[in-house]
């Protein structure tokens, strides 16, 4: 597990299959306490999926959840509410890496 300024950089190389459930829970709590350098961020809550339009209030709620635990967020799209992430993240002191979800749908790709 890589660390930077006390924050977890990556879990690459951690052999989770060789850890007990108790050890995994302890690892999770340690990571949440010390924080992560960055995290991939999804706006969706239970029952939601890509294609659903996500409002600003939900984006703010989701950012508030992760804010104490990370410095960076990576998003996966620039439409359907995801376009709100960079501004709201910045308002909360987080940096962003914005992604675009591309596929065979040229029109949707242009929106992204």
PLM feature spans:
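Boundary/entry segment of secreted carbohydrate-active catalytic domains
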Residues: 2-65, 69-71
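Generic structural signal for well-ordered alpha-helices
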Residues: 25, 60-63, 82, 86, ...
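Substrate-binding cleft of extracellular glycoside hydrolase catalytic domains
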Residues: 87-112
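A cross-family glycoside hydrolase active-site/sugar-binding cleft signature
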Residues: 40-42, 74-76, 97-101
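Acidic-and-aromatic substrate-binding clefts and catalytic sites of carbohydrate-active enzymes
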Residues: 72-84, 103-110
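Loop/turn elements at helix/coil->beta-strand transitions in domains of secreted/extracellular proteins
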Residues: 68-72, 92-95
